[in-house]
């Protein structure tokens, strides 16, 4: 893959997947660092039942997102300290063109007695675009097939269809709307069921097998999770690559990789 294509696939395909809450939470649990060396925080910001935004540190210490709301003649301030409350209230009052001496009078009344501490119940609203997850699986399956079978796979009719869809992604045409890739789906029920019984999530598994219908199928299982377990049709001419019933597979231990 050329530098431009690789960069565009990262922007328009990988980015949605790796930054999704489900994937970030897996990476956070396994302490897998991103390219910038940071461990992702999937729970960085949520909301309370009454809609207040709450930030969560990497150590799961909550703090409010500073804000000022006007309710009638009152200004209600959310802050984490006296200094922070005075600062944001002063900014708000200046924007309301209040005289400086009045601003000083009001903010001087803010002290520790004005604060209420609470243990928030934090909600996270998570939206999953399944088609974009399937697009990620399609890319991984295609790249794995090229890695295993070389240039001869590039001429396969199904490979050409997959490549055409990935080229749409590279061009940015799938940025706002992504249809379901016909070659990709979630993994079959028997595989999903077995994943649900496994407590081991620190690995990726990918395989290619031929079926009795002469189809070349990839199973892409990321973090051993049903949310990221996929099946990709790579070819309708499996006999060109594998004998019936033959399988090629790789197992990537992420915990071992991180410790090296």
Whereabouts are the PLM-identified features?
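Helix N-cap / beta->alpha transition motif
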Residues: 1-2, 57
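Short Cys/His-centered divalent metal-binding micro-motifs
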Residues: 2-30, 37-40, 48
